Every structure is written in C-alpha cells, then in structure tokens.
From Swiss-Prot:
Protein name in UniProt: Putative competence-damage inducible protein
Matches recorded under SUPFAM superfamilies: CinA-like, Molybdenum cofactor biosynthesis proteins
NCBIfam families: cinA_nterm (TIGR00200), molyb_syn (TIGR00177), PncC_domain (TIGR00199), PRK00549.1 (NF001813)
Family of the protein in this entry: Belongs to the CinA family.
Organism: Alkaliphilus metalliredigens (strain QYMF)
Length: 411
C-alpha cells in the first residue's frame, strides 16, 4: 500500500506552527508496514486543496489529511473532498447531538460554523472526536482511501490510534520492527565509513543513519511474518555494528545520553558536582532530567566571570592570567575546585567561547575545554565546536556527558 500525508493549513506554510502530525503519522504507518511515499502541505485554498487531492488519488492508495475540519470558512477539507468525490454533504445527527452536549455543558452557543462540522460526504465513515468538536471521516472509492483528521495533535493522535489503526491493520502483511542505536563522539562520515559495507549490504533489515544535535542515530528496520522473525533478522546486524563502533554506541531505544550517565553514576555510587561557564546551566539541566539523580548529584555552579571562578572554585588568578579563562589549565582547576567545594567524588567543568563574539585567532569561537576530576586525577579535553551560539552550547553539553561516560566505564 502506497500512503501519502497531506497537511492543510496556511499557518503551516507560513512557519507559524511545526507539522508534528506528519512526523507522527509517518512513524506510526511504518509500524504497520505501510510506507509513506509522499508528504505535502497546502494552504487554506480550495483550488490548491483540490489539486492535492487529485495528485494523491493518482499516485497513492491511502491519503491521510490533517487540518481544515474547524468551524470557520477557511476550514474546507471536507467540503473540497465532497466535491472531489462528487458526493453531497449530509448532516450526521449523532455528531450534531454530541456537539450540542459539548456546548451545553460549557454554556456556549452552537453557531452555524460549529454545525457545519457535523456535515460529511455521503457514505463517509464518521470518526468520533471526544477531545474536540471536529469529528474526522473516512471516504473509500475505487480502491483508494481518504482519511480526514483534525489538525490539533491532542485530537488527531487519539483519533488515529482508536479508529484509523483498526481500519489499517488488515492491510498489514508483515510486521516491521525497528531497533534504534544511539552513537556519540564520532562524526557521521567516520561512522558510515566504519560500517558502510553493513549499510550497503542490507536489504532486510535496512540500516539508516541520522544526525541530530545530541548525537547520531542508527535505525535498523526488519520485516518479518512476526515480531520474533523480524527481531532475529536485526540481532546479527546490531551485533556487527556494535562490534565495529564499540564505546561510540551509548544506548538503544528511547534512552538518552544523560540517562546513561546518571545510571552509571548511581550504579558506581559516585557523587558529582558541575561547574559551568559557557553552557550556563544546560549541562546540569540535562543530567538532572533523570529521576533519582539526587542521590549522587551534589550541586552545580554557573561561574561565568573570572571573579566567580576565582572566588567560588578557587581557580588561581595566576592560571587565568597566564592561560586565560578558556584553557585546559582553568578547566582542570574548575573541576577539582567544584569537587572540593561540594565534597563530591567527581568534578565536571566546562569553559569555552560560545560566540558570536569573543573569539581570536588563537582562541576562536567554538573553542571549548571540558575538565574532569575523577579518582584523584585531573583530565581535560579540548574541542572546536562549529555552529551558532546555541549549537555550540548544546553540543558542548553532549561532549561533556560523553567524556564523563567514557571515563566512568573505566572505573
């Protein structure tokens, strides 16, 4: 089955809101073994919506439309669908009664715009919406299926899960299973180079790399008659990849890097304190996202100025004068100073130049030092991080967590 997703709404075209519906639907359709061949967005314009319907009908078996089911005049998803299928719009009494109950309970008037939400192309299957006032519907003709869903995700997602999935299940020939591996500390090009033969040599399962701000992701997807068969196809490929990439693979599934680090700290009963400069609390924020971290997380400081580094962390003024605030030496002193101040086993520090200004030839924007005090030893790592200020700060937190993760593996 060839599937297509169409989002309707001028606000999407204008970039006022992000089309998270398409991402959700594409991912969930793949879980059913239904591949999305096309995605598109059109504004609230009858002619362009009609063109999108015509194109989808010509090339896809399934079209899922989101948006345009509201009470205003520019909500015309159903109206254009009725014209496309040459069907009359008819009132669905049950939907109208539900709508009346909804408005009566809130002491709100039911206007003509709301009433039009209870009209559907004749012969359509109605999809109830207990989370809003816009029911969806399903129209089938000529072996094709059009499914019209509301735009708000809190309405669309339950409607999809409760009504669309049961309809699509019979079309599922094979089970699709995906295993996601998370990789950090290695560039995408280098990673692909290490496993290129594995990627190129696979048909079932397939291996697809994705680059994200918090690291790289490898998705291994297999198709089988049942879940056990699909998982059996994935296992040897996953093992081969993990053997090649080693410690660069930090986890799988929904686990985050901060969760991995937090679990290692708790498992090894190592307390930690963090001193941040350029990241301004982002590093501590990521680590404290994990529930239970309070058993090992002692405290954190944002020592942005030189004075704060000297006063709060006991960094030597001479160190800053000789080497600068952004240096290996300062990062090390920040780490040990933080550990001693908090009486923690581990001190982790970050100092850098996030930009856009402040860089020099010797110390460019993106220069970062990560300091680590662990087991009585001081270490530091130098990085040059490219990108704008926000990207430099985000990636620095990732590199710092990864640096700590790798050292904890040796404890």
């Amino acid at each position: 089955m060839k599937a297509e997703i169409l989002a309707i709404g001028t606000e999407l075209l204008m970039g006022e809101i992000v089309n998270t519906n398409a991402q959700f639907l594409a991912e969930k359709l793949v879980d059913l073994g239904i591949y999305v061949y096309h995605q598109s967005v059109v504004g609230d314009n009858e002619e362009r919506i009609m063109q999108a319907y015509e194109l989808a009908f010509s090339r896809s078996d399934l079209l899922i439309v989101t948006g345009g089911l509201g009470p205003t005049k520019d909500d015309m998803t159903k109206e254009v669908a009725a014209k496309f299928f040459k069907r009359e719009l008819v009132l669905h009494p049950e939907s109208l009664e539900i709508m009346k109950t909804f408005f009566d309970a809130r002491n709100l008037p039911l206007n003509e715009g709301n009433i039009k939400q209870a009209y559907f192309p004749i012969g359509a299957k109605i999809l109830p919406n207990p989370n809003g006032t816009a029911p969806g519907c399903m129209v089938e003709e000529g072996g094709k299926t059009f499914i019209l869903l509301p735009g708000p995700p809190r309405e669309m997602i339950p409607m999809y899960e409760n009504h669309v999935v049961p309809h699509l299940k019979p079309y599922q020939k094979n089970v699709l299973v995906s295993k996601v591996l998370h990789i950090v500390g290695i560039g995408e090009g280098h990673m692909v180079e290490k496993i290129e033969d594995i990627i190129d040599g696979q048909n079932n399962p397939t291996v697809a790399p994705y680059a994200k701000a918090k690291g790289l992701t490898l998705r291994i997807t297999a198709s089988g008659q049942n879940q056990s068969i699909a998982e059996g196809l994935i296992k040897p490929v996953q093992e081969a990849i993990q053997e090649r990439l080693g410690e660069d693979v930090y986890g799988e599934g929904d686990i985050t890097l901060e969760e991995v680090v937090a679990k290692k700290l708790i498992e090894k009963k190592q307390t930690i304190a963090i001193a941040e400069s350029c990241t301004g609390g982002m590093l501590s924020g990521r680590l404290t996202n994990y529930p239970g971290i309070s058993s090992v997380f002692m405290e954190a400081m944002i020592t942005y100025s030189n004075e704060a580094k000297i006063k709060r962390l006991d960094v030597s003024p001479q160190t800053i004068e000789n080497y600068g605030a952004v240096s290996e030496e300062t990062a090390k002193e920040m780490a040990i100073g933080m550990a001693r101040t908090a009486n923690a086993d581990i001190g982790l520090s970050v100092t850098g130049i996030a930009g856009p200004g402040g860089g020099t030839v010797d110390k460019p924007v993106g220069l970062v030092y990560i300091g680590l005090y662990l087991n009585g030893q001081m270490q530091a790592k130098k990085l040059i991080v490219s990108g704008d200020r926000q990207r430099v700060r985000k990636l620095t937190t990732t590199y710092a967590l990864d640096f700590l993760r790798r050292q904890l593996m040796k404890v």
